Amino acid sequence: MSPPSANAAAHPQPLTAPQAWAMLLALVSGFALSQAFRTITAIMATGLQAEFGLSAQALGVFAGTFAFAFGTMQLFMGIAIDFWGIRRTLLVAFPMAIAGAALSAVATGYSMLLLGQVLIGVGCAPAFLVCTVFIARYFAPSRFAAVSGAAMGVGGLGMLFTGTPLAWLVEQSSWRWGFGVLAGLAALAWALIFWKVREPQAAHAGTATHATPESLGQTVRGFGALFLLPHTVGILLLALMTYASMLSLRGLWLGPLLIDRHGYTLVASGHVATAMSLVSLFSPAFFGRMDPGPGTRRRWLTGFTVLMAALFAAMGVWQLAWLDVAGPLAVGVLSGYMVLQYADVRSSYPAAMTGRAMSVFTMALFLGVALMQWITGVAASTAKAQGAEPYAVVMFTIAGMLALGAAAFRWLPAPRQQV
C-alpha cells in the first residue's frame, strides 16, 4: 500500500484496548468466512465431480480460481485501504462474496461455478489484509506477531465449519446447501462489520500527516520500489509455497485422498478436516508468542518449511491410513509457523513500505495457492492417466515445491538489517 498508510500506522488516533479488540474481532469474522470459502473443495469435491463430471485437473482449477482472484486483487485492495480506509473497502467488496456464494448455490454448469469462485475471491480479498493493517495501526509493534497469530487462530473457526458440519450438511442435502449457508453467514459478518467497525478520522489517506494523498501513479511506483530491493524475491518465493501447501491439503486433496485411498465416508473425512482445522486454530498464536526475533526468525522459517516438506513426502511414500490422518494433523500444528512470515515482512522493510510489502506478500500467498492447486491438479490427472497413484504424486509435488521455496529463501539475499 502507499505511504499515507504507513504514516497513519505510525501516528493514528488512539483507540482504547477494548475498542481495538472489538473492532478486530468484527473484522476477523469476515476473515473467518474467507477461511471457510477457501477450504470448501475438500468436502464438496465428490458432489461436484458426481454432478458435473469434473476431472482432478478441473477440480484443481475450481479450487485455485478463488485463490487466483483473491491474490490478484491484493494490490488493488491495498490501494483502496489507503484511499478509502479499512471499513469502506471491506463493506464495498464483501457483498461480492455473498453474491458469488448465492450464484454457486444455483449453478447449472462448471462455468457458473468458476464465476462464483471469482466473485467470492474478489469479495474476500481484503478480509485478512484489513486485519493486518488494523493490527499494524492500533497495536504496539512488539505485539504484531502475537496479535496476528491470535487473529489467524480465531479466523480459523471458518475452517471448522468446512469440516464435519459442512460434510454432514452436504451428505444430508447437497453441496448447494453448503454454499447457501455460507452466503447467509457472510451476510451476517458484513452486518457485524457495518455495526462495529468505526475508524478514527486520521486513520487513512488524506487525513494523515500528508496534506495531499498520493496519486495513483505514485502509488504504483511505490509498489515497484519493493522489487528493487534484492531480499524481496526470496521472501515472495517462500510465500508462494508455504500457505499453499497447507491449503492444498486441507482445502482440496484431504477429502478425496481419505475417501479414495482408505474408503472413508464424507462425514468421516470431515472429522479429520475438523481436527486439522482445530489444531491449526491454536498454532499461529503459539508460534506468534514463540517468535525468536529478527536474528533467528529466518532460520526458523527455513527449518520449519523443510520439516513441512518432509511430512508431505512421507504421506507420498507410505500410503497408510494412520499416517494420512496423523500427517494432516501434524501439518495443522506446524502451519502456525507461517505467522512468522508476517513478522519477517514487517521487520524487513522501512515503515514507509510496510503496508505495500504486506499487500504484495499476501498477494504472493494466494497466487501460490492458485499455482499449487492447479499444478497438483495437473499432476493428479497425469498420474491417473499413467496408472500411478495420484495422491502420492500430489504429495511429492507439494513437498518438492516447499523444498524449492525454502532453498530460495535460504540462498537468495536476505535483508541487510531487520527492525
Question: For the regions a protein language model found, what residue spans apply to each?
Answer:
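Juxtamembrane intracellular "pre-TM" segments in multi-pass secondary transporters
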Residues: 8-16, 200-236
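Helix-loop-helix hairpin linking two adjacent transmembrane segments in secondary transporters
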Residues: 150-202
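Helix-breaking motifs and short loop linkers at transmembrane-helix boundaries and internal kinks
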Residues: 53, 85, 106-112, 123, ...
